[in-house]
Amino acid sequence: MPNIHDVEVRDLQVNADQRGHLVEVFRSDWDEYEIDPEMSYYSMTYPGVVRAWHRHLEGQIDHFVCPKGRITVGIYDDREDSPTQGELDTFVIGEHNQQVIRIPGDCWHGFKAIGDEPSLLINYPTNLYDYEDPDEERIPYDDDRIPYDWNAEIHG
């Protein structure tokens, strides 16, 4: 259950049979996608690699899904006008815990691939990526402004 204002989590239904499984990861009638995504991309990440921290200041909302492998997602709220300013949320998602996480883009966020295999993250952002002027502010994964240790023991 998320603590941060505007973060939402939806359990995804895994429809499995003897052939494998099928999982819906985007439906326009889901509340988490109240603003339709403008694009989609995937990121393959090797075990132990951290991709953090960044945020978007132009209103983008991200929607993370991890269909293969496992990742820890970290979200930190330092928005001055937020009722949850200073809160940190973490989630472990992946092939054995299929969820979509709605992330307000103006919160710092990132993820770490955990386990022994590469992880696949799919994102459905609400803004197109602008190669000439990216809407991204970045700080190192171990920046002291965010009270999170990516190497801490995983409980989930």
Curated annotation (Swiss-Prot):
Record key words, sorted: Isomerase
A GO term, aspect molecular function: dTDP-4-dehydrorhamnose 3,5-epimerase activity
Gene Ontology CC, one term: cytosol
Pfam families xrefs: dTDP_sugar_isom
Annotated InterPro entries: RmlC-like, RmlC-like_jellyroll, RmlC_Cupin_sf
Knockout or disruption consequences: Impaired formation of the tetrasaccharide present at 'Asn-532' of S-layer glycoprotein Csg. No effect on 'Asn-47' and 'Asn-117' glycosylation of S-layer glycoprotein Csg.
Pathway stated in the Swiss-Prot or TrEMBL entry: Protein modification; protein glycosylation; Cell surface structure biogenesis; S-layer biogenesis
Ligand binding (substrate): 19, 24, 39-41, 51, 54, 109
Gene3D superfamilies, per database record: Jelly Rolls
Signal peptide: none
Enzyme Commission numbers on file: 5.1.3.-
GO BP annotations listed: polysaccharide biosynthetic process; protein glycosylation; S-layer organization
Keyword set includes Isomerase: yes
Family stated for the protein in its record: Belongs to the dTDP-4-dehydrorhamnose 3,5-epimerase family.
Function as written in the Swiss-Prot or TrEMBL entry: Epimerase involved in N-glycan biosynthetic pathway that takes place under low-salt conditions (1.75 M instead of 3.4 M). Participates in the formation of the tetrasaccharide present at 'Asn-532' of S-layer glycoprotein Csg, consisting of a sulfated hexose, 2 hexoses and rhamnose. Involved in the addition of final rhamnose (sugar 4) of the tetrasaccharide on the dolichol phosphate carrier.
Protein name: Probable low-salt glycan biosynthesis epimerase Agl13
Phylogenetic placement of the source organism: Archaea, Methanobacteriati, Methanobacteriota, Stenosarchaea group, Halobacteria
